[in-house]
Structure formats: structure tokens, C-alpha cells
Curated annotation (Swiss-Prot):
GO molecular function annotation: pre-mRNA 3'-splice site binding; zinc ion binding
Gene Ontology terms: cellular component: spliceosomal complex
Primary gene name: slu7
Stated name of the protein: Pre-mRNA-splicing factor slu7
Chief location of this protein within or outside the cell: nucleus
Provenance organism: Emericella nidulans (strain FGSC A4 / ATCC 38163 / CBS 112.46 / NRRL 194 / M139) (Aspergillus nidulans)
Function per UniProt: Involved in pre-mRNA splicing.
Amino acid sequence: MSRKPADVASKERNEYIPAFISKKPFYIDDDDTANDYLEHQRLHKQTTDQSKWYERGKRAGPAATKYRKGACENCGAMTHKAKECLSRPRKHGAKWTGKDIQADEVIQNVDLGWDAKRDRWNGYDAAEYRQVVEEYEELERLKRQAKLTKGETQTTNDGLDDEAPEQEARYAEESDMGRQQSTATRNLRIREDTAKYLLNLDLDSAKYDPKTRRMVDMGAAEDQAAALVAEENFVRSSGDAAEFERAQRYAWEAQERGTQKIHLQANPTSGEITRKKELAESEAKRDAHRKALLEKYGGEQHLKHTPLLETMVVENERFVEYDETGAIKGAPKKATKSKYPEDILTNNHKSVWGSWWHNFQWGYACCFSTVKNSYCTGEEGKRAFEEARNMLLLPGDETEQPSLAVESASRQEEPSAESHNQQRDSKKRTLMEVQSGITEEELESYKRSRLAADDPMAAFIEKDDS
């Protein structure tokens, strides 16, 4: 039984497709010859859809002479609204004036294929590159004009034009030698490149591992080879290495600028003299400019060395260790300061708030007031406080037991010789005396003599006494 002829033109035999791919299995119907299941592997011809793109700024026919309903209020076109209009906003739009109505834009439906969507140059207009060419032509014209202004004659100018290709070729050789060299030449070592294992031939020196291409077992501290090689492809610069690097960079930059050709290896003395001369000129110019600014504006006294510069915090490599609280370990501890203002006397008070304590309330020691931010009453406030407290005492105990505040005041004003001797003999005070200045005996006598206002037996005792 013969197979049906292929109807698809692209079904030519491809010798690179294996037989198990090109031949269909026996269980697949072969009736639908138009269905090529290997179409994705065929060589497709290029279609015109790949270069299809939007025609920018294309208008559809002549413009309308009358404003139409639903058109743009600004320009009068039917293809967009006023919010999407790209024309200049008019003071009075076409909807109200009916003048200068623009034609409708052509709405194009560009259906791109798989390749056209991924073509980065699709829709590019080669005419846009013309402005880049014109810009370079203008630069070349300005260069030639600058050469003529320097006094070059037309003859020498023609000679330079003849030598231009040679100079360009020489510049290409100097600036981009890597592209002209073969890959084998690039991989060759230069004479100045010393292998790591040749830095020190001592057997006890640093070992070179050829497998990892690294220095292992860096050896003793006095090993110079181990000290030079700090890490991969890095040699620590020492001595005049930094100065040599600056001279080499100066030679390269001078050659790139085209001012002078300095070859550090061919003529190192000339390059060094030129570099030092330029450094001296730039330093003298900088000093002259600085001196002129100081003479004009002054302020030389601010440039002098001050002791405050020594106390300035600068970056250093000093190791500092912190504890769990964030403080520096080993640093002297400073006395902690309160976040609240201290020793500020307000409202004529002679003491601060909290200097006096009575009946679980803080107050002022100068007037015995327990109201914060109140005005000081002085001795009158103390006297009123004593009178209010004496009202709670028994009538018979008022003469026998003087008030605690009056006793403490008289004790402070007229100290006896005996108390003076006791204070001189006892250098340490108890915790009770430090906190309140009251002894235990005085506190006990005060508790016995005072009368509690909420005592239910107080009224009963007074009735019995009467």
C-alpha cells in the first residue's frame, strides 16, 4: 500500500531529521495531509508581516468642516477624546469655535507574529540616523576650522589630510592591540610577570599548590614571599611601587590626551622630569590661587592649627568591644543623670518638689505643702500644718507632747552640748535617721499620743473621760 503524496510544499525530505521523528507511528491517522506535525522544524520563508509597523502621523482623508458629536473637544478629531489629545491645548476648543478641525487618525491593527514581536529593529526608521551623521560632520568641520585658526596653511593642512589614515592606523594599534593579537599571544606571560613559586626558593618558605594555584602554609612571619602575596592576583605594594604606578598612569594619560608621547620604559628619566615639573606648576598655581582668595576675602586665622582638631573623632582601626547594654567594656562608668530637670525652684519655694514626705504624700520641705506647683507659704504653711495636725491629738497630750516638727526645728536651732558630743562620737547614722531624721523612740511616742480620726473608740474614750 503506497503512501499519499504530500500536499504541503515544505515537506521535502530532510536528511538531518532521524527516521523515528520523520515517520509517523502506525497508530496515527494519515488522512489529514495538510496537518504537518513537523512544521516547527521546517525552514519557513520570510513573510512581509515581520516588517509591518504603525504608520506614524497618518490621517484619514480630509478634515471635517463641522464639529461632530463625540469628537475631541480640543482638536475635533473623532479617534480620541480630549484627555488623550496630543495637540496643543487651545483656549477655546474646536467644540465651541468650530475652526481648525483636525483630520481623524488612522487606527491601524498591526498583528505581529512570533518573530516580529521579538525583532528589536522592527519599526526602526533608518532616516533617523541621519542627524547623528550630520552631528559628526559638524564636529569634523569645527576641528578643521580650529586647525586653520592656529595658523596652519592650506598646504600643511593637505599634508595632514594625507597622513590622517596613517595616524588613525597607528592610534588603533596603540589603543586596541588586544583585538589584533591572536588568542595564543594574549595568553603568553610577559617578562615582568613572576610566578608565585619563584618568589622565594627556600624549602621552608610558603608552599605553592599547583592544583588550586594558591599559596598554602604561609610560613614564618619573616617570610617575605608570604607577606607579598596576600591573596589571589594581589601583590602588596611596598617601597616605590606606588610612585611607579603614579608615573605609569601619568604617561598613559598624557599619551591619551595627545599632548606629548611619554614612554616610561623607553625613557623613564624624561617622563619623571615632566611629571615632577607639571606637579610643581600645578602646586604653585594652587598656592597662588589660594593666596589671592585669602587676600581678597581674608580668613587666614581659621586655617591655622587649633587644639580642637586633635579632639576630633576620626576613623581609626582601634578595636572596641561592647557589652550587652551597649556600653564600651573597660570604660569608666559615669554617674547617670536624670532625664528630669533638677534643682529648679518654682513659685518662691526654697526647696524642690519631693523634698518632704508625710502620710504617703510628697511635698515641699519649705512650707509642708503637698500640692504640686503651688505657691510657697513659708513659715505660715508650716504653722498651719502643725495646727491641723494638733487637732487630732488628745487635749491632755497637747502640752505634754510638743509637735514633732517644732521639736525637730528647736533641736536643729539649739543643739545641746550632749547631742553635740553624741554626734561627734557616732560617725555613722542609722537608716531611719538618714531617711527622715526621726529616731525610733520619737516615732513610738508620736504613735501613742496621736489620735486616729477613723478610730471608732476615740469618741467612746472621750465620753468616759468627761
